[in-house]
Amino acid sequence: NNYCKIKCRSGIHTLCKYGTSTKPNCGKNVVKASGLTKQENLEILKQHNEFRQKVARGLETRGNPGPQPPAKSMNTLVWNDELAQIAQVWANQCNYGHDNCRNSAKYSVGQNIAEGSTTADNFGSVSNMVKMWEDEVKDYQYGSPKNKLNKVGHYTQMVWAKTKEIGCGSIKYIENGWHRHYLVCNYGPAGNVGNEPIYERK
């Protein structure tokens, strides 16, 4: 498996560790659905690109303080099946958190994760989870060293100008009576890199 040759700062590549099969591996949890529909893929991509455009055009009024400045340029994201496969294999472990190594041969890969939990008999939509990432903008101050990644890191990855591709995976399962919906999105090239700005302001 070629993924075993991919180097990361720490850990073994997710597809080396768990293999390339996208079968759920959730222990005693009852899996209700694994994977995203074509429609959900399109929805996630559209939601990301619409939000990126909104921010790039200077139309995002929220922030700490807002509004967010317009961007000189921002790539339009395209879907990448390899990133989606790596995301899906990780989601299938039902282990909420970031995996250690998810890079592709092309570039280092960033990641956003979200989980919805409810005792009701439904799992919540992926678009609501993506919206939670967008909403972190309310705590973001452009260019400030005071931004905390644990508060705004999903937002900053979403609008990272140099990121070009996205691929996501998801799993819905029941754990101790809780309906859990876990979404993983991988981004390449990765955002949140060192002291680089999320985008250059116009």
Swiss-Prot record:
Primary subcellular site in the record, as a coarse category: secreted
A Pfam short name: CAP
Reported tissue expression: Expressed by the venom gland.
Keyword Iron set for record: no
Disulphide connectivity of cysteines: 4-16, 8-101, 26-94, 168-185
UniProt keywords, alphabetically: Allergen, Disulfide bond, Secreted
Record's subcellular location: Secreted
PROSITE patterns recorded: CRISP_1, CRISP_2
Signal peptide range in chain numbering: none
Annotated InterPro entries: Allrgn_V5/Tpx1_CS, CAP_dom, CAP_sf, CRISP-related, V5_allergen-like
GO cellular component: extracellular region
Family the UniProt entry places it in: Belongs to the CRISP family. Venom allergen 5-like subfamily.
Protein name per UniProt: Venom allergen 5.01
Source organism of this protein record: Vespa crabro (European hornet)
